[in-house]
Amino acid sequence: MGIEQKAGDMGIVTASLEQLVNWSRSSAMWPLLFGLACCAIEMMGAQGANYDLSRFGMEINRASPRQADLMIVAGRVSRKMAPVVRRLYDQMADPKWVIAMGDCAACGGVFNNYAIVQGVDEIVPVDVYVAGCPPRPEALIDGIIHLHEKVKRMRLDGELREPVRLS
């Protein structure tokens, strides 16, 4: 009989250190917003009173990558902007996660030319893709929930990054 059964309904919570750390990481993500096109407008809408991202622990958007652990890339990335995205990603502290918001961030969208990166995953590893042109705030929130679930499944020594595709 384990401690969980012995404690019963005494108000004692048992958890591993790994579960506690992952709960903290998923409950207090600090986003660095990288809005490059029309998806940024929907990203701003997700932070309004109707959707309230603060209930997911994202009250404050970080202006410095050194204070952020989540980068949300919203919109198309040009070849000239690619080194900036990479530099900001490299300046973020580990562990760090990336959400590619919108079709342009995921695959270049309708801009199939030499000046546009065909997916931000060519520059940085992406954890969650949020589809849409532009995706609604509900889709971004769904992507954030998927990322929280992924973070809660991580080991303390890390895991292989597998992107989650949303329909």
Swiss-Prot record:
SUPFAM superfamilies: HydA/Nqo6-like. Its main location: membrane. The keyword DNA repair does not apply. The keyword 4Fe-4S applies. One of its GO terms (cellular component) is plasma membrane. Its cofactor is [4Fe-4S] cluster. It is an enzyme of class 7 (translocase). It is found in: Cell membrane. It catalyses: a quinone + NADH + 5 H(+)(in) = a quinol + NAD(+) + 4 H(+)(out). InterPro entries: NADH_UbQ_OxRdtase-like_20kDa (IPR006137), NADH_UQ_OxRdtase_20Kd_su (IPR006138). Its EC number is 7.1.1.-. [4Fe-4S] cluster binds at residues 38-39, 104, 133. It is a peripheral membrane protein. GO terms for molecular function: 4 iron, 4 sulfur cluster binding; iron ion binding; NADH dehydrogenase (ubiquinone) activity; NADH:ubiquinone reductase (non-electrogenic) activity; quinone binding. Keywords: 4Fe-4S, Cell membrane, Iron, Iron-sulfur, Membrane, Metal-binding, NAD, Quinone, Translocase, Transport, Ubiquinone. It comes from the Bacteria. GO terms for biological process: aerobic respiration; electron transport coupled proton transport. Binds 1 [4Fe-4S] cluster. NDH-1 is composed of 14 different subunits. Subunits NuoB, C, D, E, F, and G constitute the peripheral sector of the complex. NDH-1 shuttles electrons from NADH, via FMN and iron-sulfur (Fe-S) centers, to quinones in the respiratory chain. The immediate electron acceptor for the enzyme in this species is believed to be ubiquinone. Couples the redox reaction to proton translocation (for every two electrons transferred, four hydrogen ions are translocated across the cytoplasmic membrane), and thus conserves the redox energy in a proton gradient. Belongs to the complex I 20 kDa subunit family. HAMAP family: NDH1_NuoB (MF_01356). This is NADH-quinone oxidoreductase subunit B 2. The gene is nuoB2.
